[in-house]
């Protein structure tokens, strides 16, 4: 008997210890910052029972600050028994601003049709709006919504849950959903349920969810207009680019995609595919306004001859040797820095506004047709022939003409002043191997500066020659230093139907590079300002 009692006591002791350990483990488990209500509320007369009961649970959820979601929306007014108080409205001289839960009478019954936090109130808690058949849109940004269930919301048209710590979302049987935005969350490949049911989707944005590695868009890729999977882990098996016939905008930056074939796209307007290891990028034949950013992808060639509507390209940091824009008459912005360019053909691009082609292997560049070119940077090349002629009603007329005898190079560049953050514009003289820079002189041989980098003021007229001599040669004797010829005012623009023919200056004597500037337009610091012009 005593042995039996000892066994019972031992078993009870073990059970107590196990229970204590279990309670301790439970206490250490992470808990949500919010608490869902367990109270029961009767559905008000005239309101759909499913809609009210699903939504009142969310409205009664207490957030991490100890405030119910309903109170966060409409402080001091919210009552769970009156759904009309779940919406906050304020009148302004320009109109009414409102956010919260929207109801609408449909077939004699009030139905939940929309939820919007208006960017201004932080809502927290899990969402279960399943079978709310007339729910049309949900907009929640900057909230804390770990999970969301919209299954069988047959009228759901748009979901926007961004930067909300979302880990799982169910959109099963949401047959009419057109827009699915769930970017900046914690979704993984298994966290999106039912996407294959959403055959009407035209806008898909799941960017900034690095754990998404598999994504099946085959149910709606043919009618997609906007696709953004930036900063996700998806790869080549997830997107068939040849099926994206209707797409307007694509962003696949920072993914694992290596092959992009857009040749079947008929109306693409924006393609962003930078910072990923591309094997190739095949562009469509289309005349739509198009901007492309494919910087830092490793592509070795880029054929834009079929993109007649191309107006902006950034292909910097790629080993591309040739770019030809002769079939791109609407080209306005070219950024091709730190490539291996040997040829940059801009003939006929008379709408150019900015060209950056720094640190390449260019020996010549023709921008003479660009009468609106206000920003031109070409340092770090071996340019021997530059003609920059601007003639428009905003900037007036100015010319930069450069001819080289083969012993030095001249470039136009800028840097940002670290103190004022303004632009420092300069002409730069770089001697070839075996030569040295002597000075800048005017056309009469008067010395202007001995600094190879000469800072200039935009929209003033300059006539300068960069003098180079072989190493070891005797110094060149010049007149006393003089200031360059600067006009008081920029020349008035010459408005003609056709661009005026450039006047080629006399070729300087051997040992000099001539730089003739009749006024230079203002050049802004920083990157190119994107200015899209319709045509």
Where are these regions (language model features)?
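N-terminal capping/linker segments that flank leucine-rich repeat
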Residues: 8-13, 26-137, 175, 199, ...
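Canonical leucine-rich repeat
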Residues: 126-127, 148, 169, 190-195, ...
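C-terminal low-complexity, Ser/Thr- and acidic/Pro-rich disordered "stalk" regions positioned immediately N-terminal
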Residues: 469-509
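A cross-kingdom C-terminal cell-surface attachment/processing module
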Residues: 513-533
């Amino acid at each position: 008997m005593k042995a039996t009692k000892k066994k019972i006591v031992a078993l009870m002791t073990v059970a107590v210890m196990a229970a204590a350990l279990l309670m301790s483990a439970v206490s250490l488990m992470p808990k949500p910052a919010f608490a869902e209500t367990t109270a029961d509320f009767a559905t008000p007369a005239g309101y759909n029972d499913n809609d009210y009961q699903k939504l009142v649970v969310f409205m009664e959820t207490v957030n991490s600050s100890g405030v119910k979601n309903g109170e966060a929306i409409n402080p001091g007014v919210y009552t769970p028994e009156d759904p009309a108080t779940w919406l906050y409205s304020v009148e302004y001289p320009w109109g009414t601003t409102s956010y919260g839960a929207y109801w609408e009478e449909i077939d004699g019954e009030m139905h939940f049709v929309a939820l919007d936090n208006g960017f201004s109130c932080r809502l927290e808690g899990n969402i279960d709006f399943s079978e709310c058949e007339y729910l049309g849109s949900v907009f929640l940004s900057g909230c804390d919504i770990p999970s969301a269930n919209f299954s069988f919301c047959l009228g759901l048209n748009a979901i926007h849950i961004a930067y909300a710590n979302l880990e799982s979302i169910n959109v099963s049987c949401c047959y009419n959903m057109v827009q699915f935005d769930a970017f900046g969350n914690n979704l993984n490949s298994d966290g999106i349920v039912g996407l294959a049911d959403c055959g009407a989707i035209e806008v898909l944005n799941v960017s900034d969810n690095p754990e998404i590695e598999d994504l099946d868009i085959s149910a709606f890729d043919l009618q997609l207009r906007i696709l953004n999977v930036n900063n996700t882990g998806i790869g080549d098996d997830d997107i068939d680019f040849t099926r994206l016939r209707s797409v307007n905008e694509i962003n696949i930056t920072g993914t694992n995609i290596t092959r992009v074939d857009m040749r079947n796209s008929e109306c693409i307007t924006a393609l962003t595919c930078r910072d990923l290891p591309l094997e190739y990028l095949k562009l469509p034949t289309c005349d739509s306004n198009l901007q492309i950013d494919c910087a830092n992808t490793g592509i070795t060639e880029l054929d834009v001859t079929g993109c007649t509507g191309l107006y902006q390209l950034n292909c910097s940091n790629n080993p591309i040797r040739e770019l030809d824009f002769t079939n791109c008459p609407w080209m306005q912005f070219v950024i091709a820095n730190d490539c291996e360019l040997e040829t940059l053909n801009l003939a006929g691009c008379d709408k150019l506004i900015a060209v950056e082609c720094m640190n390449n292997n260019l020996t010549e560049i023709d921008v003479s047709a660009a009468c609106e070119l206000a920003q031109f940077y070409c340092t770090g090349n071996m340019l021997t022939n530059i003609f920059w002629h601007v003639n428009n009603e905003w900037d007036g007329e100015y010319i930069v003409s450069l001819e080289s005898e083969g012993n030095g190079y001249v470039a136009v560049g800028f840097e940002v002043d670290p103190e004022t953050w303004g632009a420092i514009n300069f002409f730069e003289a770089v001697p070839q191997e075996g030569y040295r820079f002597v000075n800048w002189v005017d056309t009469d041989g008067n010395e202007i500066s001995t600094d190879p980098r000469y800072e200039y003021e935009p929209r003033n007229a300059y006539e300068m020659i960069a003098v180079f001599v072989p190493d070891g040669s005797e110094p060149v004797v010049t007149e006393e230093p003089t200031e360059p010829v600067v006009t008081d005012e920029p020349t008035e623009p010459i408005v003609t139907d056709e661009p005026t023919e450039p006047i080629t200056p006399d070729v300087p004597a051997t040992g000099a590079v001539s730089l003739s500037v009749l006024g230079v337009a203002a050049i802004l610091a920083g990157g190119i300002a994107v200015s899209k012009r319709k045509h």
